[in-house]
Amino acid sequence: AKIVGRKIGQTSRAMQELVGIKEPDFGIILNNKVYAEGVPIKADSMMFPRIEVEIGFYLKEDLQGPGVTVLDVLAATAGVFPLLEVKDSRVKDPHNTTVVDSIADNATSGVVILGGKLTPLSSDIDLRLVGMNFEHDGRVIDSGTGVEVMGNPAEPVAWLANKLAEFGMKLSKGEFVMSGGITKAINVTAGSSFKATFD
């Protein structure tokens, strides 16, 4: 398997306080965990599946910290796209996890469903104001805007580039970065369908 993306988790202050951390966590995305929109996913292939909506950043340039800013992220981004993450947890009690559990569990990474439209960034797109409705079996169950992801979805991407620099690593051209959940994670059961609509 090949690394094709990176994920950032625990981007909200509430989630950080819940697991006793002061910053997000992060993990990798492998190519065999990525699906196109509309492709069914077997619920029984996962242990504790939960789904959430995120904004993805597709990089056209490397991002090497330290000192990466939101503006650097925007300049290095070919475009943004909607995605759904089906998180999974392989720890004994997924309702009571610590940051150590999350790190060992690849930031509760499961599978990723990529939206089919890449939107180039332009001066009239403010990621903080991008709105989203989240549907479960045809009924809207949640909504949100980009500002709910650390104030700006590009902020956690900058954070990750700077964090990786501490380990001599970088975000690479051609990878995508998942910026963190706009919605709370919803439990998934077999037979369910989910849809996210952005405006």
What is each PLM-predicted segment?
Residues 157-189:
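A conserved acidic, glycine/proline-rich C-terminal tail/linker
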Residues 58, 79, 113, 155, ...:
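Alpha-helical scaffold segments in soluble metabolic enzymes
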Residues 1-150, 193, 199:
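Catalytic-core "active-site belt" of small-molecule-metabolizing enzymes
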